[in-house]
């Protein structure tokens, strides 16, 4: 086996084994209020560990407090990354971190250099826990008066962890629809999703930077693209849904929920309106946002906003016939341009193939609903048009596979199982192709 591939295989085995252990715990009688099939338990464990949020059952009515804690832990471990949690444990025990383990972190977070890996995971853990704690305290202001101290604290903790890790799991029957008019819940969760979706690197860079102009290119691209997508998404959602799913709301509430749905759609999957009732045009817009996702080095899914931004800038510069691809007075390398184009293409192809297969298996379900579910699973978002509870066996297995591919990354999987070619010492002559 190729030396480079050994850590990748280990990472995948660690990933899959954690999912199986989570499924077994959810399947056992002591974590549930009623029996559950192992496939449903596996689906929920996969959804929690990939921080997706899709579920074939109602979490509150299916699981007791122990089951909900298992889901909470899967979300937290999945958000931080199983490798990150493992290495944090080794650091806590004062164990030496080998180059193999450093390479695992590089694979998990798509880092090019092994230097500073330990510092990275320490900052990541502190940033995550502190932000989740602050979010929990804010949510307590709304949940404790309604549910009491005990349940209110747990609901606040669960929702804060779920929001920051962009999971979208909620221990409420209608997700957050009943809280669409609660500014504390809507604003707090929106902020948690944004901070979880842009990643700790950007936040630390922003805090340490005295001038915005001194921000790194990565931070500038993430913050700019995130802001643009949130604004465009909110305005579009408001225009398309103000007389549909939000017709019963006042103007301020419509604006707040439009902002919330724009934020949560790109990766978190909470919903304050009925997704099954949205217009087809809205569904298409949400699918685009889900496909793009959040930032690298974060809990977010999708192809990543930097991938989208680089590809968009490349196309724009190509149309303008500019030789170099640059943004914020920095040139983008050919390596990153190729990576962004490849990522978008294989992701689009993967989603198309999976949707085609599901359309054959589920001929009675409309194509746009199937496509919505696949994009949601691949982007580890968790929004659903109420189809998740209707999945039969083979469909659930396929969606589990899609969620895992979305979390691990298609390129990581392909590079793991497809051996690299040995570099050639020669080049062929160029041929003519008509496009």
Residue ranges and their predicted role:
Residues 1-435:
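Membrane-proximal intracellular helices of multi-pass ion channels
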């Amino acid at each position: 086996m190729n030396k480079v591939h050994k850590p990748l295989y280990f990472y995948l085995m660690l990933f899959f084994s954690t999912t199986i252990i989570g499924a077994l715990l959810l399947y056992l009688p002591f974590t549930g209020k009623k029996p559950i099939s192992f496939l449903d338990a596996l689906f929920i464990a996969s959804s929690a560990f990939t921080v997706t949020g899709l579920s074939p059952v109602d979490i509150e009515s299916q699981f007791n407090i122990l089951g909900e804690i298992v889901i909470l832990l899967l979300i937290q471990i999945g958000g931080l990354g199983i490798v990150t949690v493992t290495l944090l444990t080794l650091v806590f025990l004062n164990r030496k971190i080998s180059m193999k383990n450093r390479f695992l972190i590089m694979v998990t977070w798509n880092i090019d250099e092994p230097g500073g890996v330990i510092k990275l995971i320490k900052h990541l853990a502190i940033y995550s826990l502190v932000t989740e704690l602050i979010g929990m305290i804010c949510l307590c202001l709304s949940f404790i008066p309604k549910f009491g101290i005990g349940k209110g604290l747990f609901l606040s903790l669960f929702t804060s962890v779920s929001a920051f890790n962009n999971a979208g799991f909620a221990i409420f029957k209608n997700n957050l629809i009943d809280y669409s008019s609660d500014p504390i819940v809507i604003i707090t969760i929106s902020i948690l999703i944004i901070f979880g979706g842009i990643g700790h690197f950007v936040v630390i860079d922003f805090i340490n930077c005295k001038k915005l102009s001194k921000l790194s290119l990565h931070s500038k691209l993430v913050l700019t693209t995130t802001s643009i997508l949130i604004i465009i998404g909110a305005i579009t959602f408001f225009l398309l849904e103000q007389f549909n799913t939000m017709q019963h709301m006042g103007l301020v509430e419509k604006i707040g929920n439009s902002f919330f749905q724009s934020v949560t759609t790109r990766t978190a999957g909470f919903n304050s309106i009925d997704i099954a009732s949205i217009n087809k045009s809205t569904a298409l817009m949400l699918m685009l946002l889900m496909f793009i996702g959040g930032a690298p080095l974060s809990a977010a899914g999708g192809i990543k906003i930097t991938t989208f931004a680089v590809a968009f800038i490349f196309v724009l510069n190509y149309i303008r016939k500019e030789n170099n691809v640059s943004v914020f007075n920095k040139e983008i390398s050919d390596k990153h341009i190729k990576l962004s184009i490849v990522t978008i293409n294989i992701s689009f192809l993967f989603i198309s193939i999976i949707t085609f297969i599901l359309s054959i298996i589920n001929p009675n379900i409309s194509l746009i609903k199937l496509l919505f579910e696949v994009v949601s699973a691949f982007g580890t978002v968790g929004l659903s048009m109420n189809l998740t509870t209707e999945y039969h066996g083979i469909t659930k297995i396929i969606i589990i596979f899609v969620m895992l591919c979305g979390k691990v990354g298609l390129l990581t999987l392909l590079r793991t199982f497809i051996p690299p070619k040995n570099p050639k010492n020669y080049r062929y002559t160029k041929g003519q192709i008509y496009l």
